[in-house]
């Protein structure tokens, strides 16, 4: 049997409600890793299991500090010859961000699988136990090597880059506009596609070369009608290095906002990345805005929250918008 480490970080999968009928009202991050493993003894038939409690938080409360700490712990684990795979139990709210970040900064061919649940461990028909079993099955599979970081939810295997939480009340909560990598049936993975984007061993970013417990400041401004420039100005004043504009449609920005945002870019060096609030599709460069003229960046198909992480990592390497644009094409 392969050796799999379960790294617990909290979330709904470690949550507890007042009664078994509380599936949506509960306290997250209450159940420790040993209890999670004990609740699914069948995982011991799949692999030799070790548990580590890295964090105990609801995932919306994760900051750069926790994200970097987790990446370093996971990196240390996969470097050990005795470890064949890692499962990370995680809150679903920001699971896609953590998965994508690890996909960019941890250099390994070993399976790293993030898993969570939509119902707390105390709920009737809790989804966490089967999800955890399936995640261990995936992480212990030799077929799961070189796939990049994955998210396993509801027996679907997703690429960290593509996956997003698309539904907040059902167990089939995670989706990818490009489809799942595969599916799991009774502990066996069946594969249908792979990602052509750079990840893990092919990434130019490396957690071992990132110092400190904070990334360059990048924030998101959500687009709508009747917008004001105040949020952009406030973030610039606070020292933020880049803003992800979660624009309407094709990453659009209202014409009455453009002069002020361009001023912040030109005079204060505030980088602007155009993403979209639309769940599917991608942002075309020089379509709604003349990005070449403005020196702005198009996020391609990355949603705003993933664009924020890639931009933060990009700023650890360069301030050149053309170089950063290439990163958005390649990752």
Curated annotation (Swiss-Prot):
Domain Asparaginase/glutaminase: 2-331
GO BP term (any one): asparagine metabolic process
Keywords from the named record: Hydrolase, Periplasm
EC number(s) recorded for this UniProt protein: 3.5.1.38
Catalytic EC class: hydrolase
GO cellular component, one term: periplasmic space
Catalytic reactions on record: L-glutamine + H2O = L-glutamate + NH4(+); L-asparagine + H2O = L-aspartate + NH4(+)
Top-level taxonomic group: Bacteria
Signal peptide: none
Keyword Transport: no
Enzyme active site: 12
PROSITE patterns: ASN_GLN_ASE_1, ASN_GLN_ASE_2, ASN_GLN_ASE_3
Subunit structure: Homotetramer.
NCBIfam families for this protein: asnASE_II
Protein name per Swiss-Prot or TrEMBL: Glutaminase-asparaginase
Origin species: Acinetobacter glutaminasificans
Lineage, opening ranks: Bacteria, Pseudomonadati, Pseudomonadota, Gammaproteobacteria, Moraxellales
């Amino acid at each position: 049997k392969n050796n799999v480490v379960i790294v617990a970080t909290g979330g709904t999968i470690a949550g507890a409600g007042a009664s078994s009928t509380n599936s949506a009202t509960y306290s997250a991050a209450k159940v420790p890793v040993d209890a999670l493993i004990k609740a699914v003894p069948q995982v011991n038939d799949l692999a030799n299991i070790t548990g580590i409690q890295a964090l105990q938080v609801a995932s919306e409360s994760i900051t750069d500090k926790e994200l970097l700490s987790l990446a370093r712990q996971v990196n240390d684990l996969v470097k050990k010859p005795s470890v064949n795979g890692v499962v990370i139990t995680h809150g679903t709210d920001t699971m896609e961000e953590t998965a994508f970040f690890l996909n960019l900064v941890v250099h390994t061919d070993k399976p790293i699988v993030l898993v969570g649940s939509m119902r707390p461990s105390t709920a009737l028909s809790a989804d966490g136990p089967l999800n955890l079993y399936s995640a261990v099955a995936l992480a212990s599979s030799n077929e799961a090597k070189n796939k990049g970081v994955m998210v396993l939810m509801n027996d679907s295997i997703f690429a960290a880059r593509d996956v997003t939480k698309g539904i907040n009340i059902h167990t089939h909560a995670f989706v990818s506009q490009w489809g799942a990598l595969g599916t799991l049936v009774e502990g066996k993975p069946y594969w249908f596609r792979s990602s052509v984007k750079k990840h893990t061993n092919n990434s130019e970013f490396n957690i071992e070369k990132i110092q400190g417990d904070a990334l360059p400041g990048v924030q998101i401004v959500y687009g709508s009608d009747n917008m004001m420039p105040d949020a952009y100005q406030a973030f610039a004043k606070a020292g933020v290095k880049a803003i992800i504009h979660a624009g309407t449609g094709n990453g659009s920005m209202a014409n009455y906002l453009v002069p002020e945002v361009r001023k912040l870019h030109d005079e204060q060096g505030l980088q602007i990345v155009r993403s979209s609030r639309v769940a599917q599709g991608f942002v075309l460069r020089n379509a709604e805005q003349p990005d070449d003229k403005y020196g702005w960046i198009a996020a391609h198909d990355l949603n705003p929250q993933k664009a924020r992480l890639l931009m933060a990592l990009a700023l650890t390497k360069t301030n050149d918008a053309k170089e950063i644009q290439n990163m958005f094409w390649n990752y």
